[in-house]
Amino acid sequence: MQNILTPKHSTYTVSLCFDGGAAQRLVDAQKRLAQICRNNFLIEHSVPPHVTLGAFHAEPGALPKLQKTFDGFAKEAREVLGGNGLDLEFGGTDSFLDKVVFLAAKKDSPSFVSLKTLNEILHQKFLPLFEAGSNKNYLPERWLPHAALAVKLRPDQFKKCAAFLGHASDFVLPQSARVAALSLALCKPYTELCRAAF
């Protein structure tokens, strides 16, 4: 008999990671919003700024296969990007369901096309082996590339964030950020398992 408190699988993400300068600018923005809306989930859980390409469920014993698949994807991603990483252009702030505030990738930019290509390749490699996670929101047909600024917001916190972002002239968000690596991470608790630099 299986213990009902023991999950059958864990959720893992494959994400794009920013270089040190870009990551710090995004952390500074996350901290400022955390002060405004009184929600510091991202800071408290030490989740570095990133763009999630995909989320997948895997059984506990599947970690070696997951890491091998990640390594194969990282090699292909380097080829797609010419081994140079990616300068990601942002198009401004947006939100999901009044619970997440994020910086969206600029839709009419070359970097957006590269992101969509990476997302499609990732799912071609991972879906035959692993189940899509996070309510399938990262599947190519549903995915909107973004870097989260605040998550798990209550309605009152979301209103504070939205009001602040709509009127804060001194709050400057980055227009672009350098993507320097890929990471494979366990979601709960957030734990980076491996990283592949471009």
Give residue spans per PLM region.
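Basic, often amphipathic N-terminal segments
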Residues: M1-D87, S111-L173, T191-F198
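Short beta-strand element of the conserved SAM-dependent methyltransferase core
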Residues: L16, L103-A105, L184
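A short small-residue
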Residues: H50, K99-F102
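Short loop/turn segments at strand-loop or loop-helix junctions that form parts
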Residues: G54, T93, A105
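Glycine-rich beta-strand-turn "strand-cap" elements at beta-sheet edges
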Residues: E89-D98, A177-C194
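Short histidine-centered catalytic/ligand-binding loop motif
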Residues: V101-S111
